[in-house]
């Protein structure tokens, strides 16, 4: 029985799964935490990865492994492969002005890369490095992403020329063309200030980036692309993830080029594209409201379902931490439309859910405006199991919603990719994440989405 391992190295933790490469049967799993912060020494990731590998009994009986990770993080190495400074993660916003400068210098950057730059992108962080730590920028001889660096460390190589990546993670750098699968040297040169730097080679998803006959490491991927593969998303699917923040992405055969910067034109893991939009406020809003009302999450769901669609006219814009889609970092939350008649806990609970779902729907609506066609909706993430969230999502989107069972989709996607390379099949394995729950659309389509879209645009 060939075995594969898949790793999800996220901002919060590292998780590993071991699966039968042919059937997908889960054989083992482990996880370890990562330190908090937006600036982290990559040595912590490496230590945690070594820990979970030890927890599953090592890699001696593992035929192949794939590593997926948080996107955008800047890991800068010197000529000897040593880390020059702590990695700046995707959620480090000190590079916002650097992003604006590069967007101004390359007015067609969204046509070149599929995305306008924001602070999260690697190119923005590289420019920040040049502007604020010129001595470190001058020493840079390799720029890698978190998953690239971990794959390279796992290989045991000491040469920066051996670092490899895949197109999905590279597409989040801001200096990569996902159509030709090649780096754009002019953007990187403008960001860093010199061209004496090595970038990871791009490896196909069904090939190994490292194979010494004993240890085989697949190309790896960015976390969203790996999650899409892990959950079984296919062309035309819209995936909505409701964690602390919210993410909407679709599988498309055409790259998007959004001049507004609200939609990132990423690549997926298989050769298609992954237009993606984020909202900063999702399940954290539900936590805040349950704490305010002094109720459990289950009680919050029941309370929201007691209210009529539209929450009696209450509009809840849940921008507690600013917002990314639309890009309003200084936005604040607002509740309006309150009257003596509608001001009750049930309407507040429902308005909170409607506000979060409408925020995600606004992000997804940008896909349609860019020509991305979607049909099936997959609802994933911690809040996806909530009955009120499920029902309200069907009403806001006006169609059935599919809810996969809980799982480690990012790690599973990395394991699938490793199995794909190991088994040398034309397509990735078909083993899936289990039976999806279908939440049917009731036919009740309140006008709340229009109200929220108008309020969002007026911010």
What are these regions (language model features)?
Residues 9-11, 109-224, 318:
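Gly/Ser/Thr-rich active-site cleft segment
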Residues 1-31, 66-104, 135, 252-257, ...:
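Glycine/Thr-rich phosphate-binding loops that ligate phosphate moieties of nucleotide
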Residues 171-273, 310, 343, 388, ...:
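ATP-dependent carbohydrate kinase catalytic cores
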Residues 49-63, 132-137, 185-195, 363-375:
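Phosphate/pyrophosphate-binding loops at sites that engage ATP/ADP/AMP, CoA/4′-phosphopantetheine
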């Amino acid at each position: 029985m060939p075995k594969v391992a898949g790793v999800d190295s996220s901002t919060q933790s590292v998780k590993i799964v071991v699966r039968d490469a042919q059937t997908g049967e889960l054989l083992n799993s482990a996880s370890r935490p990562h330190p908090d912060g937006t600036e982290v020494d990559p040595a912590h990731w490496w230590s945690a990865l070594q820990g979970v590998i030890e927890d599953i009994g090592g890699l001696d009986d593992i035929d192949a492994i794939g590593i997926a990770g948080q996107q955008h993080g800047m890991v800068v190495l010197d000529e000897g492969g040593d880390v020059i400074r702590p990695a700046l993660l995707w959620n480090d916003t000190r590079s916002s002005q650097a992003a604006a400068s590069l967007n101004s210098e390359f007015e067609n950057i969204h046509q070149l890369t599929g995305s306008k730059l924001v602070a999260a992108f690697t190119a923005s962080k590289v420019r920040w490095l040049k502007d604020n730590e010129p001595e470190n920028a001058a020493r840079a001889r390799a720029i890698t992403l978190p998953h690239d660096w971990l794959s390279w460390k796992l290989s045991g190589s000491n040469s920066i020329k051996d670092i490899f990546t895949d197109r999905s993670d590279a597409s989040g750098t801001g200096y990569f063309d996902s159509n030709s699968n090649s780096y754009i040297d002019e953007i990187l040169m403008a960001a860093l200030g010199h061209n004496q730097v090595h970038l990871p080679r791009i490896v196909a998803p069904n090939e190994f980036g490292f194979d010494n006959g004993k240890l085989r490491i697949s190309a790896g991927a960015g976390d969203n692309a790996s999650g899409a593969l892990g959950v079984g998303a296919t062309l035309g699917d819209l995936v909505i993830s409701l964690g602390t923040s919210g993410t909407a992405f679709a599988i498309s055969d055409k790259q998007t080029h959004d001049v507004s910067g609200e939609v990132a034109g990423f690549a997926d893991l298989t050769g298609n594209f992954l237009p993606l939009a984020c909202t900063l406020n999702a399940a954290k809003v539900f936590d805040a409201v349950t704490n305010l009302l002094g109720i459990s999450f289950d009680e919050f769901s029941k309370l929201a379902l007691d209210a009529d669609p539209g929450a009696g006219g209450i509009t809840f814009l849940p921008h507690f931490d600013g917002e990314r889609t639309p890009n309003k970092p200084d936005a604040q939350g607002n509740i309006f439309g309150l009257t003596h008649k509608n001001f009750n806990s049930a309407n507040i609970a429902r308005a909170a859910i409607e506000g979060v779902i409408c925020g995600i729907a606004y992000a997804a609506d940008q896909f349609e405006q860019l020509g991305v066609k979607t049909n099936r909706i997959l609802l994933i993430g911690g809040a996806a199991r909530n009955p009120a969230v499920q029902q309200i999502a069907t009403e806001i989107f006006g169609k059935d919603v599919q809810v996969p069972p809980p799982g480690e989709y990012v790690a599973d996607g990395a394991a699938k990719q490793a199995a794909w390379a190991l088994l040398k099949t034309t397509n990735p394995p078909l083993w899936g994440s289990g039976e999806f729950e279908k939440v049917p659309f009731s036919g009740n389509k309140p006008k709340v989405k229009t109200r929220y879209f108008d309020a969002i645009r007026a911010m």
